[in-house]
Amino acid sequence: MAVPKKKKSKSKRNQRHAVWKGKAAIAAQKAISLGKSILTGKAQGFVYPIEEEEEE
């Protein structure tokens, strides 16, 4: 006979949710930091194309 599963507690659910939100916050912070370093030109791990001016 089918028996319903035990219900997880709200505190456990909130704990898992907090972990997920924390990981998302860390990823967002890294993305912001990377974007700032690219915009300022201080990023060392990227190769930027050099625009050559044509002289006539």
Swiss-Prot record:
Coiled coil: none annotated. One of its GO terms (cellular component) is large ribosomal subunit. InterPro entries: Ribosomal_bL32, Ribosomal_bL32_plant/cyanobact, Ribosomal_zn-bd. Pfam families: Ribosomal_L32p. It comes from the Bacteria. SUPFAM superfamilies: Zn-binding ribosomal proteins (SSF57829). One of its GO terms (molecular function) is structural constituent of ribosome. Keywords: Ribonucleoprotein, Ribosomal protein. One of its GO terms (biological process) is translation. Belongs to the bacterial ribosomal protein bL32 family. NCBIfam families: rpmF_bact. This is Large ribosomal subunit protein bL32. The lineage of its organism: Bacteria, Bacillati, Cyanobacteriota, Cyanophyceae, Synechococcales.
